[in-house]
Structures are given as structure tokens and as C-alpha cells.
């Protein structure tokens, strides 16, 4: 049996960072979202025992090939749809509670399904909000989607769970690519949908209306380190509605996280404290806030960081290779086969 609880996470200045979710117990094998790994840099992201994405790391560790499985039987049934009454209930709690309440809403949705979608670990939901890009040519203009930029709010302390996303790294939601190379050196993190949406669906029109009214719930994404990508868990139609309206949405980023402490270096502490005392003696008017911040940094040894677990169950990857080969051939993507299987980046003719 699986049970869970959450707590609001604050930085040392008491600014809200997000919602920490602890999951304990046992999840039936193969039902939760999980990463599998094997030899030759081969990976698979699975849901309910079926692969959502296959991945193959390049041999020079400069990127990863992603193959999207459009045939997954549960693509459209991951979470229950957000209803109008859900939006109204959260609106009644006020603007200040909007983001935190959506974190709680999605935590419940992920865990209260008949088979919880999160494995027993520590999880974190953090907001990633529209931000300005520091480019002079964007001044006094309305940026197009390629110029959108999103980041987590700033925090005090050593919190290594900060996210960023560029609009130019959005992938098509109406006709997602079967195969994509993620460049770890020159590209940003990709935003990957799990299935193609219907651009004529009635709910898309409804979400466009909510977007114009400023009532669009956040898009829920999962950051997966091994894929260097954000995978949309909930909100494909909300995201597309925002793109069509030209109004940047907000995101909630789900990730695994861990907390550790730096080892104590007493000699370093003593050196810094002597230097600060000397600074105050020589300059009584020095910035006390700066000195206090240095002391806080000196004694605060905790740091929070994101991680992604995987189960090493793919072995030598022969079964993985058979699945990928059959899938790419069914969809006329054989031109990518050699690169995906071998972790290479040779020129590929357009496979359509």
C-alpha cells in the first residue's frame, strides 16, 4: 500500500519554493511512471508497463536520441481532466494561493488514482513562470513563442532545483516528431508532449477562453535528467491554447529531489570569520547585511538538488533494440535507425 504527505518548502528567507511530496510504501511493479536503463546508454520511460519514450545516449555524451511512442495505449488517460469547478474552487482561495493550490491539486491527482503514478521517493513541485529575456531587441515588442522564456522564482540558499525553459524548445503538439535529437551542449531542455492533440477539439476553444480570462491552470511537466527534457504530464490542450493566444502559460515542474549537507571545514570557517572581523574593525560603516549573508552561507550546509532514479532492467538492450526497430519501421523512420541504435550522429535524410 502507498501513502503520501506533503509540506510547503521555504527558503531561509521564508519565501515559498514549492510543494515537497513524500511517497512511502510499495507501488505495484510497472504501474508508476519510471525510467529503465541498460547497456549502451539505452533508456525507456514507461507508464503502466508500456514505453512512452525510448532514448539512446550519444557515445560522446553530447546528447540523446528520443523516440516518441505514439502507440501507447494510455496516452490520453494519465490524469482526470481539469474541470471548471476545480478552477472555481481554487479561484475562491485568492490570487496568492493560486500556484500552491494547483500544486496540491496535481499531487492528489497523481497519487489518488487506483494505481499511484509516483514511485515511493521524495518529489518536488516547483513553479516555472514567464520571465523576461535579457535581449535589447525585445524591448517594446510583444515576443513571439520562440522568444518566450520561463524560470523558477529566485530563492535564498543553495537550492539546486532551478528550472528554465525557452519557447524555441517547444515541440509541436499537433504533429510531434517521432524522433528527436536533444543536444546537451548547445540546446536548452526540450518540452515534449506525449501525444498529438486535435486542433479542432472543443476543449481547445474553451481553454483559449480561459487563457484570455487569465484563468488558465498551470501545465504540469516532469523533468527527467536522463532525457534532458520536460515531459508534459497534464495540460497539452492548455499549452496549445496559450500558444494560439500568444499568452505565455505557467508551469509546475515535477522532479525527484534529495537533500544533503556539505562537510564542515572548520579551518575555512575560522579564516572567513577572522576576515569579517578585520573588515568591520577597519571599516565600521561596512555593509552589515552583506556580512550577515556571508555568515549565513558559512553555516548553512544544506543543499537541495534534483535527481532521476532509473531501474537497470534493460540488460544488454536487445529487447529495447527490437522494440525501437519495429516501431521506427512501422512509422517509416528507418533513416534514424542506425543513429538511434548505435548512439551516433551521422547525417540523416528527412524521414518525413
What is each model feature region?
Residues 3-23:
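N-terminal intrinsically disordered, low-complexity regulatory segments of eukaryotic proteins
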Residues 19-231:
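Short alpha-helix boundary/capping and kink motifs at helix termini
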Residues 93, 108, 112-113, 210, ...:
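Surface-exposed polar/charged interaction patches
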Residues 224-226, 253-260:
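Short beta-alpha junction loops
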Residues 229-244:
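A sequence-level detector for short glycine-anchored, His/Arg-bearing signature motifs
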Residues 246-249:
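Short glycine-/polar-rich loops that comprise or flank the Walker A/P-loop
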Residues 258-322:
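Amphipathic, charge-rich alpha-helical segments that serve as recognition/docking helices
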Residues 309-352:
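C-terminal catalytic or substrate-handling cores of phosphate/nucleotide-
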Amino acid at each position: 500500500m502507498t501513502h503520501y504527505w506533503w509540506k510547503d518548502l521555504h527558503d531561509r528567507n521564508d519565501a515559498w519554493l514549492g510543494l515537497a511530496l513524500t511517497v512511502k510504501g510499495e507501488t505495484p511493479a510497472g504501474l508508476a511512471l519510471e525510467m529503465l536503463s541498460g547497456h549502451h546508454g539505452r533508456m525507456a520511460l514507461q507508464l503502466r508497463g508500456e514505453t512512452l519514450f525510448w532514448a539512446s545516449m550519444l557515445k560522446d555524451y553530447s546528447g540523446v536520441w528520443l523516440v516518441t511512442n505514439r502507440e501507447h495505449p494510455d496516452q490520453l488517460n494519465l490524469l482526470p481532466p481539469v474541470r471548471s469547478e476545480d478552477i472555481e474552487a481554487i479561484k475562491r482561495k485568492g490570487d496568492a494561493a493560486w500556484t500552491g493550490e494547483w500544486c496540491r491539486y496535481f499531487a492528489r491527482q497523481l497519487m489518488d488514482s487506483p494505481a499511484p503514478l509516483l514511485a515511493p521517493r521524495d518529489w518536488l513541485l516547483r513553479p516555472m513562470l514567464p520571465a523576461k529575456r535579457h535581449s535589447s531587441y525585445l524591448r517594446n515588442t510583444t515576443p513571439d513563442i520562440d522568444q518566450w522564456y520561463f524560470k523558477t522564482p529566485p530563492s535564498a540558499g543553495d537550492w539546486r532545483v532551478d528550472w528554465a525553459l525557452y519557447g524555441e524548445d517547444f515541440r509541436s503538439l499537433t504533429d510531434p516528431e517521432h524522433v528527436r535529437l536533444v543536444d546537451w551542449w548547445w540546446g536548452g531542455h526540450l518540452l515534449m508532449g506525449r501525444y498529438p492533440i486535435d486542433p479542432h477539439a472543443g476543449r481547445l476553444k474553451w481553454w483559449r477562453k480561459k487563457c484570455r480570462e487569465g484563468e488558465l491552470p498551470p501545465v504540469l511537466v516532469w523533468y527527467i535528467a536522463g532525457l534532458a527534457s520536460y515531459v508534459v504530464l497534464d495540460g497539452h490542450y492548455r499549452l496549445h491554447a496559450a500558444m494560439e493566444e500568444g499568452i505565455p502559460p505557467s508551469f509546475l515542474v515535477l522532479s525527484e529531489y534529495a537533500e544533503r549537507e556539505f562537510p564542515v571545514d572548520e579551518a575555512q570557517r575560522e579564516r572567513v570569520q577572522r576576515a569579517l572581523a578585520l573588515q568591520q574593525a577597519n571599516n565600521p560603516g561596512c555593509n552589515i547585511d552583506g556580512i550577515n549573508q556571508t555568515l549565513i552561507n558559512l553555516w548553512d550546509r544544506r543543499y537541495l538538488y534534483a535527481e532521476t532514479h532509473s531501474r537497470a532492467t534493460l540488460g544488454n538492450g536487445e529487447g529495447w533494440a527490437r522494440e525501437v526497430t519495429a516501431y521506427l519501421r512501422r512509422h517509416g523512420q528507418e533513416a534514424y535507425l542506425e543513429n538511434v541504435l548505435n548512439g551516433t550522429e551521422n547525417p540523416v535524410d528527412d524521414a518525413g
